[in-house]
Amino acid sequence: MGNMDVMKIENLTKQYKGFRLDNVSLRIKPGEIVGLVGENGAGKSTLMKAALGLIRSDAGQVLFWGQPLQQNSVEIKNKIGVMLDESGFYHTMNAQEAGKICAGIYKDWDSAKYETFLNKYGINMKKPIKDYSKGMRVKLMLATALCHGAEILILDEPTSGLDPVAREEILEDFKEFVSDGKKAVLISLHISSDLEKIADEIVFIHQGRQVFTKSSREICEEGGVDMIMNEYVRGKSI
């Protein structure tokens, strides 16, 4: 697929009563990690869900490798790893059973890689998911997202509930994921310093509107994500 954008969002809009995701555009090239920042309720999760077709958008277009998700849907969906929360499996299951379900869904499921990630993350394959900590459930969802041949990961707060050591480990996994220059990641993180470490570009969304898209280098030179966001919210120009 050469240098074609892995994902391209053009003028995506979603209207709810009392909230509007307004005309958001971004593009993710092979080898890139693009981060979303903004206050709770800014529209980051809405953007991800609309991009994936989980909710219907009111306007705009989303392309994966130049194609709408509706075309060749199964083929494209097999190449997308998604984590929007940590509750993707029935909590009465264990990790081994979750892996068997994934093997039946994804044609490129890698059982050996899955077991490697479970061991790396310290996940007991036989322990019921209902007995996991929140951090362990997050790690399980990440393991499944990383093991089915995905070429783009779309991740909403994937490090939520993790201790600093586990966060660092998983951030390194994301960088490793894109290191071949072919894959990509769209990610939101509540700890902006983590995003500055791994993202190539950062998109700031405030009250449903896209304020800017800038490189991490630019943002760090201007004082960091938190400083820029706070100045904007206080009414200063970006």
Predicted regions and their residues:
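ABC-family P-loop ATPase nucleotide-binding domains
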Residues: 84-140
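Helix-to-loop junction immediately C-terminal to a conserved catalytic motif
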Residues: 52
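Helix N-cap at the start of a conserved alpha-helix in ABC-type nucleotide-binding domains
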Residues: 164-166
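Conserved ABC transporter NBD signature motif
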Residues: 60-71, 75-76
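The feature captures the beta-strand-to-loop junction immediately N-terminal to the Walker
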Residues: 37-39
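Conserved beta-strand
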Residues: 9-12, 19-29, 60
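Catalytic Walker B motif of ABC-type/P-loop ATPase nucleotide-binding domains
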Residues: 153-157
